[in-house]
Each structure stands twice: as structure tokens, then as C-alpha cells.
């Protein structure tokens, strides 16, 4: 389809190429061209090129769509195995997307009332660590389930969004302003921002969970060569710090849990029973205290003047 053509699909169509439909710009309801998949309609193996639009209305379904840069899919029905090669997928209320692969500055927008499952994110982190670029990768305001974030991939979970069962590999990251549940960091990073919560995160070798001022993490497990950083004003409770795991924090944070010595805590300016190793660090600020601290190989205890 080209030159403002329009295909309305009530039955089944295969192998179409769409290069028109976005005359009014991305994700604009004023667009009327392109391929429209209606209730009961199915489109398979569609190619959407620059300027092209595939619109999937409620009750419609598509599979194996490939979207290049400048093309988009407006989804209110179901989409399976969409590949975004620089293209965009906009999920509207009621939409379900399964198996989307996001490449080469592609963008999946998971809006409230939508569910994205088994997404693979290979782009979004090109702007550097924890950059709020927000227009590549996966942008979650609904529900994202079983997402895999690879090198250069980024998932941004906004305040109203939830990410469940995410795996983050080295070079990828997850930025949390909403809720993240059951994240596994296999060398990847998780940033928990003010108002964000992360529950049951597992930090494996070279992984890093950073809990910022106003962020909250619960039930984090830090395995050997993993790292948990809790900034001033951040909170991490029920931490399990395994031997060889690193805790980086200060007495201006709140951290509780267990390590190989037993229960430890950093609460209201008082640190007790903290183990520091493998890059672990505790800054004891002026007027604060630390008792029973154990500093092993690679650990640092910094006591400020008056601490």
C-alpha cells in the first residue's frame, strides 16, 4: 500500500507491504490510511516501511509483522512476534503484544490497560546509563511480563507501570519509577528512582541494583560479585547479602537484612554488623556511628570527621 491507500481487513491477508498511513505523524488518531485489521480479521507477515501504518482494532490480530524506522503499529487487538527494526509499536487499552523484539532504536509503548509479554529489548540504552531518553526501547505504563533486556537494551517503568519477571543482561538496564517484581540482574543494572519499588530482585555476578533517594527495594538477594547500592534517602529492607556480594551505602540510607555474620542494619544514622568486601563501601557521616563492622578484601569503611 502506498499513496494514502487503505486496506480494511475482515478476513485474512498475508505478505502485504505498507508504506502509507502516518500522514499525521506517529500514534495520531487522525491517520486514516495504511492497513486496518478489524474485529475478526488477521494479517500475517506484513512489512511496514517508513511512513506506513498497521492499525489493529479490537478483535483483530496480527503475526510476524516487521516494522522499519519511520513505520508504526497502532495496537488495540493482539500482536504476536512483531519485530521493530527501528519502528514503533503503540499499545492502546485492551491491547496484548506477545514476543515483540525491539531492535535498532525501535520503541514499544505499553500504555495503561495493556499487557506486553515475552518482549526482547535490544535497544534504548544508547544514551548512557540511566538516561531518561524514553523514545527507544520499552516504555511501560501498563504491564510488562517476562521481558528480556539484552546489551544496549532499556526498559523504563513509569509510575503507573509494572514489570514482572524481567531478566537484565550485561549492558542492559531497567529504570523503575513504578513497580518491578522478580527482576534478575545477570550483569545488568536496575535503577530504582524516587517513588519506585523493586521487590524480590536477584543480583548476580556483575549485576548492580541502585536504589536512589526515595526509592524502595524489598527482599533483594545479592550473590557473589553482585552489588547493591543504596543512596542517601534510599531504602532496602530484608536484604540477603551472600558471601562475595557488595553493599555500597552510607549512614544516610536505610538498609536491613542478613549477611554471613547474621542480621545487619543501617538505620537512622547507626550501622551495625555490616560486612564490606568485593567493592563494598560504607560512609559513616558526621554524627553517625558504625559498630561491629567487618572490612574484608576489597571493602572500604570511610568514617567522616565527627563520625
Give the label of every model feature segment.
Residues 1, 203, 222:
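Calmodulin-binding IQ motif alpha-helix
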Residues 4-6, 11-16, 21-22, 33-35, ...:
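The right-handed parallel beta-helix/beta-solenoid scaffold, focusing on the short coil/turn
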Residues 26-28:
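Surface-exposed intrinsically disordered loops and tails
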Amino acid at each position: 500500500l502506498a499513496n494514502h491507500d487503505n486496506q480494511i481487513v475482515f478476513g485474512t491477508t498475508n505478505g502485504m507491504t505498507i508504506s502509507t498511513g502516518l500522514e499525521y505523524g506517529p500514534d495520531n488518531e487522525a491517520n486514516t490510511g495504511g492497513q486496518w485489521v478489524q474485529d475478526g480479521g488477521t494479517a500475517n507477515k506484513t512489512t511496514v516501511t517508513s511512513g506506513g501504518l498497521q492499525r489493529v482494532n479490537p478483535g483483530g490480530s496480527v503475526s510476524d509483522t516487521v516494522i522499519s524506522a519511520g513505520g508504526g503499529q497502532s495496537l488495540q487487538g493482539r500482536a504476536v512476534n512483531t519485530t521493530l527494526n527501528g519502528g514503533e509499536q503503540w499499545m492502546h487499552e485492551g491491547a496484548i503484544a506477545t514476543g515483540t523484539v525491539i531492535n535498532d532504536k525501535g520503541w514499544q509503548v505499553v500504555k495503561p490497560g495493556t499487557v506486553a509479554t515475552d518482549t526482547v529489548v535490544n535497544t534504548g540504552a544508547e544514551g548512557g546509563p540511566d538516561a531518561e531518553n524514553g523514545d527507544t526501547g520499552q516504555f511501560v505504563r501498563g504491564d510488562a511480563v517476562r521481558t528480556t533486556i539484552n546489551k544496549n537494551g532499556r526498559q523504563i517503568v513509569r509510575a503507573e507501570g509494572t514489570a514482572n519477571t524481567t531478566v537484565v543482561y550485561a549492558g542492559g538496564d531497567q529504570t523503575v519509577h513504578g513497580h518491578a517484581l522478580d527482576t534478575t540482574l545477570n550483569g545488568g543494572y536496575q535503577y530504582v528512582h524516587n517513588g519506585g519499588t523493586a521487590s524480590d530482585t536477584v543480583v548476580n555476578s556483575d549485576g548492580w541494583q541502585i536504589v536512589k533517594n526515595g526509592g524502595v527495594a524489598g527482599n533483594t538477594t545479592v550473590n557473589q560479585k553482585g552489588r547493591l547500592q543504596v543512596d542517601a534517602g534510599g531504602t532496602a529492607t530484608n536484604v540477603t547479602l551472600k558471601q562475595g556480594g557488595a553493599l555500597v551505602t552510607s549512614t544516610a540510607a536505610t538498609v536491613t537484612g542478613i549477611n554471613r555474620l547474621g542480621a545487619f542494619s543501617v538505620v537512622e544514622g547507626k550501622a551495625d554488623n555490616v560486612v564490606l568486601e568485593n567493592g563494598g563501601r560504607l560512609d559513616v557521616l558526621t554524627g553517625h556511628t558504625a559498630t561491629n563492622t567487618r572490612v574484608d578484601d576489597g571493602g572500604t569503611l570511610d568514617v567522616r570527621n565527627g563520625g
